[in-house]
UniProtKB/Swiss-Prot annotation:
Its cofactor is Zn(2+). It comes from Vibrio atlanticus (strain LGP32). Binds 1 zinc ion per subunit. This is Protease HtpX. The keyword Nucleus does not apply. Belongs to the peptidase M48B family.
Length: 287
C-alpha cells in the first residue's frame, strides 16, 4: 500500500510541476494551446513523462520515505531467513534478486517497488517480522515478489501515463474554451484565466481518474494473492491475510500504499488501493 501511494503522490507532484512549466512555455513563446493535435502530443509527453520519472525514482524515494535499511550482509538469523526466502522465491518466478530492506514500523506491512523486474526492492516492516509467523511472513514476501514478477509497477506506470495524458489534454482543452469566451471581445485568449482553469481542472480530473487507478490496484492485488498462493500454498496466504485483519492500520504513503500487502481503509471501496481483506480471503478459498 505504501508503494502505490508514494507512486501516485510523486506522479501528481511531477505532473503539476510539468504543468506549470508547460504554461510558462505557452506564455513565453506565444504558442497557442488551442491546436488539438499539438496539445495531444504535448499532453502525452508530459503525462507519460511524469509517470516514468516517478517510476525511475520509486526505489530511492521508497527507501528514503520509510528510513529503510538495506541488508547488505545478514547480521542475524532473521535477516538470513529473509534473504534466503526472497532469493528462493525470486528464482522460482524467474526474476533477479531484489534489494531487500527492513524499516522500523509497528505496522504489519511490506512493499515492493522498482522500475525493472531484475532491479527491484522488497521492504518489510519490523512489525511484520515481530508479529507474523514464518509461514505468514513467507506468504507476504511471495505476494510482493509476485508483484515484481508480474511487472505491476511498469503496468501501473503505463496506465497512469494514459490517465495523465487525458487529464492534461481535457483540462487544457476546456480551459482554452473558457478563456476564449471570457476574453472574446479582445480577440484572444485570456492566459491568466487559461492557467487558472487548467490547473483547477487538472486537480478535479486527477481526483476522478484516481478511481481508475485504484480499481486497477485492487484488481492487481487479487492476482498477487493468487500467485503467492501458488508459490507457498493458499493456506499460508490466507493465514497472513487473517493476521492483517487484526493488525494496526498501515501508515504507508503515496505510491508505496498501492504495492503494499495491507492498505488503509477508506470511506468507499472505490477509493481503496486494496480490496477488503474478507474479499481477498474469500477469493483464495475459492481457488
Amino acid at each position: 500500500m505504501k508503494r502505490v501511494m508514494l507512486f501516485l503522490a510523486t506522479n501528481l507532484a511531477v505532473v503539476l510541476v510539468l504543468s506549470v512549466v508547460l504554461n510558462i512555455v505557452y506564455a513565453v513563446t506565444g504558442m497557442q494551446p488551442g491546436s488539438l493535435s499539438g496539445l495531444l502530443v504535448m499532453a502525452a509527453v508530459f503525462g507519460f513523462g511524469g509517470s516514468f520519472i516517478s517510476l525511475m525514482m520509486s526505489k530511492k524515494m521508497a527507501l528514503r520515505s520509510v528510513g529503510g535499511m538495506v541488508i547488505e550482509s545478514p547480521r542475524n538469523e532473521t535477516e538470513h531467513w529473509l534473504m534466503e526466502t526472497v532469493s528462493r522465491q525470486s528464482q522460482q518466478v524467474g526474476i533477479g534478486m531484489p534489494t531487500v530492506a527492513i524499516y522500523d514500523s509497528p505496522d504489519i506491512n511490506a512493499f515492493a517497488t522498482g522500475a525493472k523486474r531484475n532491479d527491484s526492492l522488497v521492504a518489510v516492516s519490523t512489525g511484520l517480522l515481530h508479529n507474523m509467523t514464518r509461514d505468514e511472513a513467507e506468504a507476504v514476501l511471495a505476494h510482493e515478489v509476485s508483484h515484481i514478477a508480474n511487472g505491476d509497477m511498469v503496468t501501473m506506470t503505463l496506465m497512469q501515463g494514459v490517465v495523465n495524458t487525458f487529464v492534461i489534454f481535457l483540462s487544457r482543452f476546456i480551459a482554452n474554451i473558457v478563456a476564449s469566451n471570457d476574453n472574446e471581445e479582445e480577440g484572444g485568449s485570456n492566459m491568466m484565466v487559461y492557467f487558472g482553469v487548467s490547473m483547477v481542472l487538472e486537480l478535479v480530473f486527477g481526483f476522478l481518474a484516481s478511481f481508475i487507478t485504484m480499481w486497477y490496484s485492487r484488481h492487481r492485488e487479487f492476482h498477487a494473492d493468487a500467485d503467492a498462493a501458488h508459490l507457498v500454498g493458499k493456506e499460508k496466504m490466507i493465514a497472513a491475510l487473517e493476521r492483517l485483519k487484526v493488525s494496526h492500520e498501515p501508515q504507508l504513503e503515496g505510491s508505496m500504499m498501492a504495492f503494499g500487502i495491507n492498505g488503509k481503509k477508506s470511506l468507499t471501496e472505490l477509493l481503496m488501493s486494496h480490496p477488503p481483506l474478507d474479499k481477498r480471503i474469500a477469493s483464495l478459498r475459492n481457488m
